[in-house]
């Protein structure tokens, strides 16, 4: 359960690593606090003419939200148009890469449903980020592999030869 009352799950039955879900609808599963057997439903995504999603519908961060974030940091700061576009593009690319990696994790555990734990696992392992409001009781701590003595000796030899 998240701060909005229910966690959203995305159906991955039509997802492949090279394609994205249809822009007209996304399957979302609403999960009550205790029950995990709620059926999957379709949620429409706003589209512009021609059946294609508008650029505003695809963006996670709008220009207004970006300006609000900048005002929180420094009320007197103004961003150039190019900087705004670049920050919006970086945010979109980040979300796309996180969702893609989370979908691959869901596929790896042989599930057709993207769950919060998939996104959470990717963010914790790759970006060292935690999602507020979601405990990590299911995710075991990530331990880096111990370096062996043989590896240390090889690395020392490499460093020694590089100094010469």
UniProtKB/Swiss-Prot annotation:
Any one biological process term the GO annotation gives: RNA polymerase II preinitiation complex assembly
Record's GO cellular component terms: SAGA complex; transcription factor TFIID complex
Domain Histone-fold: 59-131
Domain of life: Eukaryota
An annotated Gene Ontology molecular function: protein heterodimerization activity
InterPro entries in UniProt: Histone-fold (IPR009072), TAF12 (IPR037794), TFIID_TAF12_dom (IPR003228)
Keyword Membrane: no
Keyword entries, A-Z: Nucleus, Transcription, Transcription regulation
Pfam family, any one: TFIID_20kDa
UniProt keyword Lipoprotein present: no
Location in the cell: Nucleus
Disulfide bond positions: none
Chief location of this protein within or outside the cell: nucleus
Biased composition (Low complexity): 14-25
Disordered: annotated segments: 14-56
Gene3D superfamilies linked: Histone, subunit A
Subunit structure: Component of the TFIID basal transcription factor complex, composed of TATA-box-binding protein tbp, and a number of TBP-associated factors (TAFs). Component of the TATA-binding protein-free TAF complex (TFTC), the PCAF histone acetylase complex and the STAGA transcription coactivator-HAT complex.
UniProt similarity note: Belongs to the TAF12 family.
Function: The TFIID basal transcription factor complex plays a major role in the initiation of RNA polymerase II (Pol II)-dependent transcription. TFIID recognizes and binds promoters via its subunit tbp, a TATA-box-binding protein, and promotes assembly of the pre-initiation complex (PIC). The TFIID complex consists of tbp and TBP-associated factors (TAFs).
Matches recorded under PANTHER family: TRANSCRIPTION INITIATION FACTOR TFIID SUBUNIT 12
Protein name stated in the entry: Transcription initiation factor TFIID subunit 12
Organism per entry: Xenopus laevis (African clawed frog)
């Amino acid at each position: 359960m998240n701060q909005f009352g229910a966690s959203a799950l995305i159906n991955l039955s039509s997802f492949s690593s090279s394609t994205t879900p249809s822009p007209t609808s996304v399957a979302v599963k609403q999960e009550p606090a205790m029950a995990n057997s709620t059926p999957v439903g379709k949620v429409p995504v706003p589209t512009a003419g021609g059946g294609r999603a508008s650029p505003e519908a695809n963006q996670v961060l709008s220009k207004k939200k970006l300006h609000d974030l900048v005002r929180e940091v420094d009320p007197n700061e103004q961003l150039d148009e190019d900087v705004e576009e670049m920050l919006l593009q970086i945010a979109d690319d980040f979300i796309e890469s996180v969702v893609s990696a989370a979908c691959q994790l869901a596929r790896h555990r042989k599930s057709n449903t993207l769950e919060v734990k998939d996104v959470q696992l990717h963010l914790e392992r790759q970006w060292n980020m935690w999602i507020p409001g979601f405990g990590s009781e299911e995710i075991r701590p990530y331990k880096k592999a111990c370096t062996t003595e043989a590896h240390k000796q090889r690395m020392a030899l490499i460093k020694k030869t590089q100094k010469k």
